[in-house]
Amino acid sequence: MNTIYTGTPDSRLYKEVLGKTIGELLEADEKVVYLDADLMSCIGTAKLPDKFDRAVNCGIAESNMIGIAGGVAAAGMKPICHSFGPFASRRCFDQLFLSAGYGKNDITVIGSDPGITAAFNGGTHMPFEDVALYRTIPTAIICDTTDVTMLRAFLFMAKDMPGVKFVRVGRKTSYPVYPEDTEFKVGKGFVLRDGTDATIIASGIMVHEALQAAIKLEAEGISVAVIDPFTIKPLDTELVLEYAKKTGAIVTAENHNKIGGLYSAVKETLDGEAKTGYVAIEDEFGEVGPQDYLRTRFDLTDDHIVRVVKETIAKKG
């Protein structure tokens, strides 16, 4: 596809776009209800309760918030919930699984500051396992947003989709990739760059790193495709298998533990169809620090992707 990627950060902050988008959803659809776990000031939604009685601060009580969302959904409304990533996943998982998933109540959950983007909030606030948890909820839909265009598109889609929908989103800047008129479809990925020697499948903040890695590899004469899956669940398995056969080497890149996330989903799909490698968090906890430090600390860099791609290509013999 034709992208607008230049490697230049967006002037818009995620939280500004998120607040504006939720306001638009509340304005456009009287069935939309916005629930927040006392973090409205962190995500650009602090003024919404002044305008909408359907914007509610549930306090620091995430499990209760998801229970409320299940009840609101059962009454025919369209709840959108927000908390920081770990509290929108592991803290309220039983309610997500039962009140939403098992109860067939349609809710959308926003988990902000996923993975290393939690930065100075530290390891307690740094979810490396949220995608893995949501993947175990039958029929759940998971999106790790690449830029604000994808974020807006997913939220407008999600409010009318059945089941549990989980979206990972940062609060600060992103790197624009998608034109505003991009047509997003659940379960359909995008080929951002084509290539023949290897394929990088990347999600969220790692899409930028993957594209930078592909540029560096191209300068060395190595042709690398870059795929953004859009939804990690359901995964575009046809596209994954197509590029496994085309390039014979697949490397995943994610801001998440290697266990249970994008790498796991891709490996489950491939079943030996290609040589594989991964760039992800190893089996460890998060820690405090600026994003640049954490990116290097956990090997979530374009240079590390370059190394893993070369190693994976070498496995082809």
Name the predicted role of every residue range.
Residues 1-162, 166-168, 173, 183, ...:
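Thiamine diphosphate
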